[in-house]
Swiss-Prot record:
Lineage: Bacteria, Pseudomonadati, Pseudomonadota, Alphaproteobacteria, Hyphomicrobiales
GO MF: rRNA binding; structural constituent of ribosome
Keyword RNA-binding: yes
Any one of the GO BP annotations: translation
Subunit structure: Part of the 50S ribosomal subunit. Contacts protein L29, and trigger factor when it is bound to the ribosome.
Keywords of this entry: Ribonucleoprotein, Ribosomal protein, RNA-binding, rRNA-binding
Gene3D superfamilies per record: 3.30.70.330
Family, similarity comment: Belongs to the universal ribosomal protein uL23 family.
The organism of origin for this protein: Methylobacterium radiotolerans (strain ATCC 27329 / DSM 1819 / JCM 2831 / NBRC 15690 / NCIMB 10815 / 0-1)
One Pfam family named in its UniProt record: Ribosomal_L23
Cellular compartments per GO CC: ribonucleoprotein complex; ribosome
Name assigned to this protein: Large ribosomal subunit protein uL23
Length: 98
């Protein structure tokens, strides 16, 4: 199973926070993904990039905050995250990278 270049565009980066680290005990990994990526695309990309079996994908969109910088109003970009559940016996070490 070789990774296609488009798979690297779908999975942007791993999320390394306290909550995301606690989810690894439940065999789940959290990734930032492209805003227009669908669940089947995310599943295929993770399976090909990390050579694991994915059982479920849950997604969420965090809306960007409104900010004022030097008197100008702006808004940060929305961020889409995917919580990927792995099959038993499969693990991903996100600290090593690809």
């Amino acid at each position: 199973m070789s990774a296609d270049p488009r798979h690297y565009d779908i999975v942007v980066s791993p999320v390394i926070t306290e909550k995301a680290t606690n989810l690894t005990e439940q065999n789940k990994v959290v990734f930032r993904v492209a805003p227009k990526a669908t669940k089947p695309q995310i599943k295929e990309a993770v399976e090909k990039l990390f050579d694991v079996k994915v059982t479920a994908v849950n997604t969420l969109v965090t809306k960007g905050k409104k900010k004022i910088f030097r008197g100008l109003r702006g808004q940060r970009s929305d961020v889409k995250k995917a919580i990927v559940t792995l099959a038993e016996g499969h693990t991903i070490d996100v600290t090593t990278g690809l």
